[in-house]
Design a protein with these regions (language model features):
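Conserved N-terminal diphosphate/IPP-binding helix and adjacent helical/loop segment
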Residues: 1-8
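Amphipathic, well-packed alpha-helical segments that form the structural scaffold of globular domains
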Residues: 4, 32-39, 43, 154
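Surface-exposed polar/charged interaction patches
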Residues: 9, 182, 186, 229-232
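Divalent metal-dependent catalytic cores for phosphoryl transfer on phosphate-bearing substrates
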Residues: 15, 44-219
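Phosphate/oxyanion-binding active-site loops and adjacent basic polyanion-contact surfaces
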Residues: 23-38, 141-149
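Non-catalytic terminal regions of proteins
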Residues: 206-244
Length: 244
């Protein structure tokens, strides 16, 4: 249900105007890719070591769900910040039921993400094709798109899944709450690291089609991670994620 709801909002939208995943459907493709890559990376972080043995399996699943969902939703705010989506043509039907697909509306038919999903908008207004009027790069709306993660997490993730997550280990809940407050921010939590690294690698792969991330790209991630650990006085403790 979370994936279907997410697709209803992002579907044919690009991931950016001129950068990575700029094609139609790029936002959904990039988001799903980041969710998957972050899920794979989550195995390198042991955040359930303090759990009771009977709860560890459930807590591990909760951790995996949190990482995947945060990766999936990390760019969802772009539906608000990317630009103005409007109908270019709509479908009209005559009295005989025949359809005309090239009618240009006389009044603007604009999508409002705060009102309904893109899928609902297309269905409700019989939109045949739409375009995006991108906001200027310096405009404030292009910033802080990550701050929408909290809203869409609670809107798109089914209640049973949210209940399962919030009933899990307090450490997992804390990591999720921190991410909601500042997605992809400066926090050096396991969740932020997993999603940020997945985001960076997915973008690089998009900019180099048909190629795997080069050793240089991956080494940049590794160097950044080592610098982060160098600032942590506990980097060489047995429970450090660098040691694990």
């Amino acid at each position: 249900d979370a994936l279907i709801g997410f697709a209803a909002y992002t579907s044919a939208l690009p991931g950016s105007r001129h950068n990575h995943h700029w094609q139609a459907g790029g936002l959904f493709a990039h988001s799903l890719d980041v969710g998957h890559k972050a899920l794979v990376a989550s195995a390198s972080f042991n955040v359930t070591h303090g759990s009771h043995s009977m709860d560890r399996e459930a807590n591990t699943l909760a951790w995996q769900l949190v990482v995947f969902l945060c990766g999936l939703l990390h760019d969802v705010g772009k539906v608000h910040s990317m630009g103005r989506v409007f109908a270019r043509t709509v479908v009209l039907r005559d009295e005989a039921g025949r359809e005309r697909h090239d009618y240009r509306p006389t009044q603007p038919v604009v999508w409002r993400p705060s009102v309904c999903s893109l899928h609902e908008w297309v269905s409700r207004f019989d939109v045949d094709s739409f375009a995006i009027e991108f906001y200027p790069p310096g405009k404030h709306k292009t910033q802080h798109h990550a701050l929408w993660v909290d809203r869409y997490f609670h809107q798109l993730v089914p209640q049973p899944l949210r209940a399962f997550i919030y009933d899990s280990d307090p450490q997992i809940v804390r990591l999720l709450d921190e991410f909601m407050q500042e997605p992809l921010g400066a926090a050096q939590s396991a969740l932020n690291k997993a999603v940020k690294d997945a985001d960076a690698i997915s973008a690089l792969e998009s900019l180099s089609p048909g190629e795997s991330p080069s050793k240089v790209h991956l080494s940049n991630v590794a160097v950044r991670r080592i610098k982060e650990f160098a600032e942590d006085q506990l980097w060489n403790f047995p429970n450090s994620t660098l040691i694990r």
